Amino acid sequence: MQITDVRVRKIAAEGKMKAIVSVTFDNEFVVHDIKVIEGQNGLFIAMPSRKTPDGEFKDIAHPINTQTREKIQKAILGEYEKVKNEETVTEEKVEE
């Protein structure tokens, strides 16, 4: 299974959630609403989830093993950093 596309939508509001991401696998299957969160130990991803009646959050879709989670997280955070850096460069050029 290959990650063939990662689309990042940055969140403008202040807070721990930095972006919402869609990831396409093998140009055939997409998972939307993966969140990029800033935690105490740096950035991490949170898979799409829903709130149960008792207030608990359950993942809708998620990797089954650590290796796959790390692969997805690496691709998402890499693309997030690119988007973040591109916007910083654009903002600096506008200010000059």
From Swiss-Prot:
Pfam families: SpoVG. It comes from the Bacteria. InterPro entries: SpoVG, SpoVG_sf. One of its GO terms (biological process) is division septum assembly. Keywords: Cell cycle, Cell division, Septation. Belongs to the SpoVG family. This is Putative septation protein SpoVG. It comes from Clostridium kluyveri (strain ATCC 8527 / DSM 555 / NBRC 12016 / NCIMB 10680 / K1). The lineage of its organism: Bacteria, Bacillati, Bacillota, Clostridia, Eubacteriales.
